[in-house]
Amino acid sequence: MKKQICVGVAVLSLGAFAAHAQELGSPAQSRPLVKTDAVTYLFPEQVSVPAGKPSQVALHFRIAQGLHINSHTPSDEFLIPTTFSIPDGSGVRLDAATYPAGSSITLTYDPTTKLSVYTGEFIIQARLVATAGNHLVQGKLHYQACDQNQCMPPKTITVAIDVIGK
């Protein structure tokens, strides 16, 4: 009986070791990214704007270290652009959004291709038109985050802003 238990433990240990060794030896391109909060909305949380008149509001975001996101005008038609939107019916309309110019980078696996991306902190200038009153706006930032080896699936985060139309 003791011999059977020892053999069973040995087989399980070898299986776990083999699985761990495969994981360590797999190429970086096939490992999933573990970062889940690639982009964070920083501020403002609340803005006051004249009711019915277009007003510029600077929306501040931070990208996690080691990651980048495609700019609003990516260098390839197959890359997903960063976009900001506000849903209809919120009492606030996004009249226009001005995005920063992207930085040009090359990836280690393809130094011939230049990408237009955002890294670190970036600001989107949103021209908002609000009706009179207090509006909790649930804006949406849509982006795709990548590192030097691979990209995560596209993601949309909520950008909550209390817009007061006076």
Task: Please provide the spans of the model-predicted regions.
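Extracellular/lumen-exposed scaffold segments
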Residues: 21-166
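Bacterial N-terminal signal peptides
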Residues: 8-16
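Bacterial N-terminal signal peptides that target proteins for export
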Residues: 1-9
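Intrinsic low-complexity/disordered segments
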Residues: 1, 17-19
